[in-house]
Amino acid sequence: MPDVIINGPDGRLEGRYTHGTDPNAPIALILHPHPQHGGTMNNKVVYTLYHNYVRRNFSVLRFNFRGVGRSQGVHDKGEGELSDAAAALDWLQSHNPNASTCWIAGFSFGAWIGMQLLMRRPEITGFVSVSPPANMFDFSFLAPCPSSGLVVQGRADELVPEPSVEKLVDKLQHQRDITIDYRVIDGCNHFYKGHLEALDTHVDTYMDKALRQAEEAKNAPAAVDDEEPAIEEDD
């Protein structure tokens, strides 16, 4: 898990990176919670997400937003952090030019940034959004949401009430061709204390299903048109 330095839009960004062993290994970018409330790339939820993808032999990157740890710059209320995430994804793609798929996962503030990046980068295949702060930030930009994904929420979350996330999920579920797998963990607070294993299990279950479905779709035979071509009659 080497340390990496990424050239961000406002200076250097500090990251941790694991490179997949397959030359076509898929990639995943992991985004941390709010920088002004102690959020870093070493957050336990972020660490759990990171290692879930490492176990799957993804090439995985997590990094500190501007002004956090050794990353340069200052907090920019989300706008600059979105630019940081875009730069990190550029770096990840440049080191994995043959990646088969691209995933993004974020926790809290990182989930909000990740969903915005999802709207801007059509190459992102799917997402995992943990405790998206639907009561704090505007998610109306997801109109429509371009990809199916997983949302995980704690029922005892004291910072992001579960009903606010359920309302967001219901809105997304009504969009055409989009499936949101919504999982609520009973007794779980915002920081997943004592529930990291349950979170990891939900991510495992969803990723197993999503990757299996993607593989089946890729290997499915092409549809054959059974209708015979029309024969034009001579005048």
Report each predicted region and the residues it spans.
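Gly/Ala-rich beta-loop-alpha elbow adjacent to hydrolase catalytic centers
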Residues: 106-114
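Short alpha-helix in the alpha/beta-hydrolase fold that links the catalytic acid
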Residues: 147, 161-171
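Catalytic histidine neighborhood in serine/cysteine hydrolases
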Residues: 172-191
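Short beta-strand/loop motif that positions the catalytic acidic residue
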Residues: 145, 150-153, 157
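Acidic catalytic loop of the alpha/beta-hydrolase fold
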Residues: 156-160, 190-191
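Serine-hydrolase catalytic machinery in alpha/beta-hydrolase-like enzymes
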Residues: 6-96
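Alpha/beta-hydrolase fold nucleophile elbow
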Residues: 96-107
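Catalytic histidine-centered segment of alpha/beta-hydrolase-like enzymes
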Residues: 73, 188-200
